[in-house]
Design a protein with these regions (language model features):
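Gly/Ser/Thr-enriched, mixed-charge loops and adjacent short helices
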Residues: 10, 14-18, 40-49, 158-294
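Phosphate-binding and adjacent anionic-ligand microenvironments
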Residues: 295, 299-301, 305, 322-326, ...
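Gly-rich Lys/Arg/Thr-decorated short loops/hinges at beta-loop-alpha junctions or inter-strand turns
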Residues: 50-66, 89-94, 112-116, 193-207, ...
Length: 557
């Protein structure tokens, strides 16, 4: 069917007057020869927005390829059809949303579609953090959950994240994001759903719920150590213009961290994220305002939660840094938290993703704990058998899987603050603890190499070049293993990626991003530390630099 005719049909079934009229206006302009309008129509109708294990995520706008009311309505119709098929008795669904553009409208529509489909709906308060939705999965023992969020994506984006539990998913998958084959089953049901304006909607089975008090109690209970040490810790907290400021401040206060200073300019939800180029605490410059405030106030710790508060970044004083502060990498934080929890008698296993540092496995071994390596994403990490703590290098941490089976930046802030408070009380720093771990287990240094692309085909081309001509030597060390992760790897399900391992133990994993137009390479080198000698940082940086140069040439982006 001709593009403009398909677009015209979509617009005629779009129940949102704003997106329907915007698409219709572009169709009319395109018919008059307006090339820019024609390009916008092409982008809006470039195939249905794909539903996968991450749910939906895309730019907010009109058409089948964007995040909008019509897409959310049809997605919810498909989800409810699948949940009803698998549930025992009346299915239950919890729905939450952040404060991005369209979030509250999308969540309200999801509630009304589910209600009309015979699903009992628990509607969370508007503008809530993702961990509250994750918490609600287990707290209310529901069959499914929807969180409308694009997490730390740029301002124009939104998304639709799906969890399963209750009678639909039990065991290690209860309360966790979807994995295959549920993603394909839901995608097929969405494709079979009627046009959005023909999907029934009502309010009959919607009930407002608010489990914030219960969540605050669980998260604040993760605090440990002397009360005086917690009171003595000076924290600067930023929520990156998201929904996490009030609840994270409350949890820290309930946990005994009374000396918390908010970055006020970033504390109120604002979908434009005006003070940061990207609302991602990992991005360069994202913590500048927090660092400036921390320097002025003589703080001990910066905690940054991302816009939906499921991820947590830390920064600490660093006398070697020009700014006097340095952020910790996800691997540094994950290793510190894993060691901290294990040393305090944590039961259960430690787990991290295949692209995260191998240091956690050595920490687990030292404490007599099981360790599990998983595929990337908490849909896999949270399924690790007997999980006690899990993390991924992209500053996602799960410190309380008994209550939240997903990454949780708010709960993480409590464990991290407890760790830094305990170190301060001993007269030690985070850097001292990282050095201790390096001397015990070897210096593990990880670094990303990221290629952001304009055309998605460039990612596939780069991966194809790597598979066709993998390196034989990296940083002077022979390559001893090249594994295509799409064929499965050491018992893990297949995933798009390539792992390269050298004789020296250097490792690179290349994979496409699941949420952004990026090809990501995850590098890690491990060096032994001689007793009484300085840590071999220069050697590690030299090896990482050589590996980055080689991979940039191979991938060709």
């Amino acid at each position: 069917m001709e593009l403009l005719e398909r677009a015209r049909q979509w617009a005629s079934h779009d129940p949102d007057p704003a997106t329907a009229s915007a698409l219709s206006a572009d169709i009319e302009a395109a018919e008059r020869g307006d090339e820019e309008a024609a390009a916008r129509v092409g982008a809006a109708m470039n195939g249905p927005l794909q539903f996968g294990t991450a749910g939906l995520r895309g730019v907010v706008g009109p058409g089948e390829s964007r995040m909008n009311l019509a897409v959310v309505i049809r997605a919810t119709a498909g989800l409810c059809e699948v949940v009803t098929r698998h549930a025992t008795g009346t299915p239950t669904l919890v729905v939450g949303c952040d404060a991005r553009y369209g979030s509250s409208e999308f969540a309200a529509a999801a509630c009304r579609v589910a209600s009309a489909a015979g699903v009992r709906v628990l509607a969370l308060p508007q503008a809530n953090p993702t961990p509250l939705t994750s918490f609600s999965m287990l707290h209310f023992d529901v069959d499914a959950g929807v969180m409308v969020t694009a997490s730390h994506n740029p301002a124009p984006d939104n998304g639709y994240k799906v969890y399963l539990g209750g009678t639909v998913a039990q065991g290690d998958g209860r309360g966790v994001q979807i994995v295959p084959p549920f993603d394909a089953e839901i995608a097929a049901a969405i494709e079979a759903a009627p046009p959005a304006d023909e999907v029934p909607m009502n309010d009959d089975l919607i009930e407002a719920v608010d489990p914030r008090e219960e969540y605050v109690a669980c998260a604040s209970a993760l605090a440990s150590g002397e009360a005086s040490a917690r009171e003595d810790l000076r924290i600067v907290l930023t929520a990156m213009h998201g929904v996490g400021a009030a609840i994270t401040s409350r949890v820290l206060s309930e946990a005994g961290f009374s000396n918390v200073s908010l970055v006020e300019a970033q504390s109120e939800p604002d979908p434009d994220f005006p003070t940061v180029p990207f609302p991602n605490p990992e991005e360069a410059g994202a913590l500048d305002m927090a660092i400036e405030q921390a320097r002025e106030q003589g703080a001990d710790l910066i905690i940054a939660v991302d816009p939906d508060a499921d991820r947590c970044a830390l920064a600490v004083p660093d006398p070697t840094s020009e700014k006097g502060w340095s952020p910790l990498s996800g691997d540094q934080t994950g290793s510190l938290l894993g060691e901290f929890l294990a040393s305090r008698g944590m039961t259960g296993s430690l787990a991290n993703s295949i692209v995260s540092s191998r240091l956690l496995s050595r920490i687990a071994q030292a404490h007599g704990l099981e360790h599990h390596t998983t595929l990337t994403g908490f849909k896999w990490i949270a399924r690790a058998p007997g999980l006690g703590f899990g993390y991924e290098e992209a500053i996602g941490f799960c410190p309380d899987p008994a209550h939240v089976r997903d990454k949780d930046g708010i709960a993480t802030s409590i464990v991290a603050a407890s760790l830094v408070a305990a170190l301060k009380a001993q007269g030690r720093s985070v850097w001292d603890e990282l050095e201790r771990l390096a001397r015990l287990h070897g210096l593990h240094v990880s670094s990303p190499l990221t290629f952001r692309v304009e055309e998605i085909e460039q990612i596939a081309n780069g991966m194809a070049r790597l598979r066709a001509q993998p390196p034989s030597v990296l940083a002077g060390s022979p390559v001893v293993e090249v594994s295509d992760l799409s064929q499965g790897y050491r018992g893990l399900p297949p995933t798009d990626g390539v792992l390269v391992l050298t004789e020296a133990g250097d490792r690179v994993i290349a994979r496409p991003s699941g949420t952004e137009p990026k090809l990501k390479c995850y590098l890690e080198v491990i060096l032994p530390v001689a007793e009484g000698e300085p840590l071999p940082w220069d050697q590690a940086r030299e090896r990482l630099g050589a590996i980055k140069g080689a991979f940039a040439e191979i991938i060709g982006l």
